[in-house]
Structures are given as structure tokens and as C-alpha cells.
Amino acid sequence: MRVLAAMSGGVDSAVAAARAVEAGHDVVGVHLALSRMPGTLRTGSRGCCTIEDSRDAWRACDVLGIPYYVWDFSERFKEDVVQDFIDEYAAGRTPNPCMRCNERIKFAALLEKAIALGFDAVCTGHYAKVITDADGNPELHRAADWAKDQSYVLGVLTHEQLKHSMFPLADTPSKAEVRAEAERRGLSVANKPDSHDICFIPDGDTAGWLAEKIEMTTGDIVDEAGTKVGEHPGANAFTVGQRRGLKLGTPAADGKPRFVLEIRPKENKVVVGPEALLAIDEIRGIKVSWAGLPIAEVATGDEFDCHAQVRAHGDPVPATARMERLTDDDGAERTNLVVTLATPLRGVAPGQTVVLYQGSRVLGQATIDTARSLQRAAL
């Protein structure tokens, strides 16, 4: 099988490519140049996609004896990931750029080009598993190492994309084993640190970066009753659940800290309140997609049991979900996902992604439109 190995320059993608070669596939390595911005390309940057990463990817391919190419996807990345990130924050939502990159770059643009060039699959170093059912249909599942599992950020993959995806690290019990294997194979990235920052914000200062991209205007911080309790330098720099950076001139009556409950970009207001008000047990999602073929209840509209996860390394909680068909004022029909949580979650923000699981299987995902407490709504 002809396999295109996406080489990030890290240890995971290097070992994944090595295993693909060892399995007898015809492997070609490619590194994606995703940015021309000096901040992400300079030596010493903490994000990914740096000059050092490109060199590390080349060295790994050289050790493995496979061809190496660099593909420039910087313009598409800027439009589909970076600009989307800016637009979402400007609208008062909290996006996940890694999911957007997987959805539109690594498993859309990259896979499309790979298929056009005659490759059968794209191989990455993600910790996730593709299982083929009895009818030959792919299913996305968690990796053996749940501590490193990345199935959440792959929940955006479609049935067709999963058919052409290869995750050689699926059954690896730990990251330590991956590093040990890299050492045995003579790969120089064996002890390279993991990258945790947003790649286009390498210094980790998201608020500072956004301040350069979005016009920030001073506005009011109000409590849940609408009373002004402070001022902010720009509502777009905040997210639901945040406490740090709030400059409150009026302390809470009970003396307890307050957290961001809501962002109102049109009013340029940040709503704050006690931590207890962050708890939600109903999520309504838009832009719904299914990882593989959807389960039967999706077509019938029946409620189904599942687990819901709202962060890449968050704990999944028991839930029920159903599809809700709505008609807009202009007569257009749309379908939303309604998720009811058995255990309330805190700090869930519009723009985040909810991913649904049954056991280890990823069912699908949706972008969170609203999140609320059914118990408080009933009062």
C-alpha cells in the first residue's frame, strides 16, 4: 500500500512512519509548512511547525530511508485555521484550532492531495484506532493508552476520511514505549519534548496575540443581575470559566471569587458570577458530523445513551443524546444535536466541541452553540 506519512518533526510521527515502513508499505514522508509568520518559524519557538521541526522530520526520513518532501499549506492554514480562530473569538466563542486543523488541513487538504497523487492512506502519529466492522466500514476508537488518547480531536473525521487514515500508535501502551522504540531505531527525536502550545501562538499568550488581531474596546463586567462590577480591556479575550485577569472593583457579597459565565460581544460585556453557576447539564450543538457511519438512532431521531467529552483530555461523562430537527424563520431546515448530561460539567463555552462516545468508539461531534443548566431553567 502506498502511504503518505505526515511528519511533524516529533517522536510520535517518526515512530508511526517507521512502523508503516516495517509493515511493508511504500512510504513517503511529508512535512506541512503551515505558517510563514516569523513568530512560528524562528529558532527556539515553543510551538510546532518550526524550522527545527522541519529539519527533525527530514532527519527521521533519512534514517528510515524514505523520500521526504515539504508541502506549503500556509495560505490554506491561515484562512481555515488562523482566521477561523480569530473570527470565533471575535464572536464571543472559544474555538479549538487543533480540531479545525485536523478537519480542514491534515485530513482534508492533505488527504485530498495524497489521494490525487495515488496514495492509499495518510499515516499520522495520533494516538487513536481505526477498526473495520463486519461490513467493511471504518470506526474510530480510543487508543490503548487512554492517557495519551487523541480520538477527541479526530472526532471531526468523516467515514471517507477514516477509510484512508492509518494510526500505527493505536495499540501502544504508553508514550514511554514510543520514546524507547525511537531510541532503538536511532531517531534523534527520541527525547524531544511534546508540543502543547497553539502552534501559531508559540509564546502561549493567547490574549496578547488576539489583542493584535481583534480591535479591543473597554467595556463593562457585570454580574448575573446586570450590575456593573468592573471593567475589561476587551470582551473577546475572555472565555467561559475564566477567573484570571478579571479586574473587579466591587467584591462579591459572599466574598467568594467570581468566574466568567458568558461573553456578550455585541454589548461588549463580560458576565461573571459564582463558580456554582458554571455547572451545566444540557448542550445544544451545531455543525454535527459523524465519525464513520452514524448509528441507527441518528436517522430515527430516537434518544441514545453515550458519554460526552468537551475537552481533549477531559473526562467523559454519561449522557443521552438525540437529533433535533428545526425550521428557521426563512423556512430552511437544520438539524441540531441535544446532549443531556447525567453529571454536570463546568466551564463549557460556545465554540468548544462536544464529542460523543459509546464505549471506546467515537460516534461523532458537534460545535457547542449553547450550554445551560436544566435545573436552574426550571426554577
Curated annotation (Swiss-Prot):
Keywords: ATP-binding, Cytoplasm, Disulfide bond, Nucleotide-binding, RNA-binding, Transferase, tRNA processing, tRNA-binding. One of its GO terms (cellular component) is cytoplasm. PANTHER family: MITOCHONDRIAL TRNA-SPECIFIC 2-THIOURIDYLASE 1, TRNA 5-METHYLAMINOMETHYL-2-THIOURIDYLATE -METHYLTRANSFERASE. It catalyses: S-sulfanyl-L-cysteinyl-[protein] + uridine(34) in tRNA + AH2 + ATP = 2-thiouridine(34) in tRNA + L-cysteinyl-[protein] + A + AMP + diphosphate + H(+). The active site is at residues 101, 199. It is found in: Cytoplasm. Catalyzes the 2-thiolation of uridine at the wobble position (U34) of tRNA, leading to the formation of s(2)U34. Residues 148-150 are annotated as: Interaction with tRNA. The record marks 126, 352 as: Interaction with tRNA. Belongs to the MnmA/TRMU family. Disulfide bonds join 101-199. InterPro entries: MnmA-like, MnmA-like_C, MnmA-like_central, MnmA-like_central_sf, Rossmann-like_a/b/a_fold. GO terms for biological process: tRNA wobble position uridine thiolation. The gene is mnmA. NCBIfam families: PRK00143.1 (NF001138), trmU (TIGR00420). One of its GO terms (molecular function) is tRNA binding. It comes from Arthrobacter sp. (strain FB24). Its EC number is 2.8.1.13. Pfam families: tRNA_Me_trans, tRNA_Me_trans_C, tRNA_Me_trans_M. ATP binds at residues 6-13, 32, 125. This is tRNA-specific 2-thiouridylase MnmA.
